[in-house]
């Protein structure tokens, strides 16, 4: 009998949520996702030293201004790690826009263009890249523009239905609704423990998946942020799931049978009118968990981006 991971791959596309190339080689996912925290972690792997050195050298050639060099080195390093991953995965890499641009539509679009250009200069077509943006109103609007240009986007830090609905209405290629961070909030708020089937994060992704399929939206649903394999098993049948190496290993070492839980709707119903900005902001604001977790997620990614830049600045000044 195939292990749990292999069974799962026959139902749902598995994506590796890591910048660790050795882990990606081990589990052979279709795609991979990175974020500022994972890039920071990857930058400390000794085997990646040459990628940092290349980013530093490139940044110095672009500008004499130290602040600009730091920014350029950060972008180039994220792309360098993405390029290494693309040598292994047959599909796509998700590379994230600086979290400090989460409320800046024009800045997000400009950064996306820069990242795509760096990949293209390295011989990688934009069809293999997903630009990751936070699911703020501005991030969703930036994604809408980028999708029109043929640049596919992955909308992340997605915690509630209003965010998911706005992404579908914007024609976004893929969303990453979070599971584990939703569970964290509810456990802290209620003091309760939840079974995998009752897990508020699992329920959220299931509802989003069902809504998308019922209304015929093409946006890919890729569940993210898992705390245990129980959550993953409950979402068997989701379009894609992005999973960290520790849980991938647990699945590879398990023979728990996998049963498809999510199924596409048989009948498609036309959706209603799109959410206005005011409606989106009000609906989002009504969800205390989503408000808190989005803000926290953006802050934490920005902190890790800052740590990475401090490290790169020291290298540039050396």
Swiss-Prot record:
The active site is at residue 132. One of its GO terms (cellular component) is cytosol. The keyword Metal-binding does not apply. Gene3D superfamilies: Aldolase class I. Pathway: Carbohydrate degradation; pentose phosphate pathway; D-glyceraldehyde 3-phosphate and beta-D-fructose 6-phosphate from D-ribose 5-phosphate and D-xylulose 5-phosphate (non-oxidative stage): step 2/3. SUPFAM superfamilies: Aldolase (SSF51569). It is found in: Cytoplasm. Its main location: cytoplasm. It catalyses: D-sedoheptulose 7-phosphate + D-glyceraldehyde 3-phosphate = D-erythrose 4-phosphate + beta-D-fructose 6-phosphate. GO terms for biological process: carbohydrate metabolic process; pentose-phosphate shunt. The keyword Cytoplasm applies. Keywords: Cytoplasm, Pentose shunt, Schiff base, Transferase. GO terms for molecular function: transaldolase activity. Pfam families: TAL_FSA. InterPro entries: Aldolase_TIM, TAL/FSA, Transaldolase_1, Transaldolase_AS. Its EC number is 2.2.1.2. Homodimer. Belongs to the transaldolase family. Type 1 subfamily. NCBIfam families: PRK12346.1 (NF009001), talAB (TIGR00874). Transaldolase is important for the balance of metabolites in the pentose-phosphate pathway. This is Transaldolase. It comes from Shewanella loihica (strain ATCC BAA-1088 / PV-4). The lineage of its organism: Bacteria, Pseudomonadati, Pseudomonadota, Gammaproteobacteria, Alteromonadales. The gene is tal.
